Amino acid sequence: EVMWLMEQVMWKSLDKRVAAFLLEEASIEGSSVLKITHEAIANHLGTHREVITRMLRYFQSEGMVRLSRGMVRLLDEDRLRQLQD
């Protein structure tokens, strides 16, 4: 139970961090299309690529991003902003 709770807390925190990172990168690049790998995002956020891949797939299933090799396209920046708050 404790491990489940810790995972939930870390997951909730990570979704906010990933959303904030994607929005910041889009702002810096001036584009909703980010040419960045899951590995690079993981390195920036201090986590593992597999964790970022799961989170980005979740974002994709919710219609917030579209994933392709070496690229993340932001589709719903408003929802990402809501998520980061």
At which residue positions do the language-model features occur?
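Phosphate-/nucleic-acid-contacting segments
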Residues: 14, 23-85
